[in-house]
Amino acid sequence: MAYGPWNQEQIDAAREVAFPILLGHLGAYYKLDPHFQPLDVSRCSQRVQVAYQGRDFRFIFTGRKFVNELLPADALQRGGGGAIDFVRHLTGYNFVQAVKVCLDALADAADAS
């Protein structure tokens, strides 16, 4: 099944883009919380403070999954899994726009290295 102009391989690649690459591409300010201690150290979770377009966020990233800690625990779409969901949460973009942002960020990162 095709989603927009991309094939499944491209969409899978878009989902895997790391959050620092996306945040840099979007021009967001972010910093890791050096005092964060995850409940389960083996899961390698990180807390990240993000400022984007005048809004503040506090995310917990565990692998591809994320949770916005500043939203109430029972809020719908408080978190998600993968870079596409993350871009949609942060920017309010739709799926097609979010995939494009992820792929553009991936291309920019490849060009920079």
Task: Annotate each PLM feature.
Residues 1-113:
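N-terminal structured subdomain of primase-like DNA metabolism proteins
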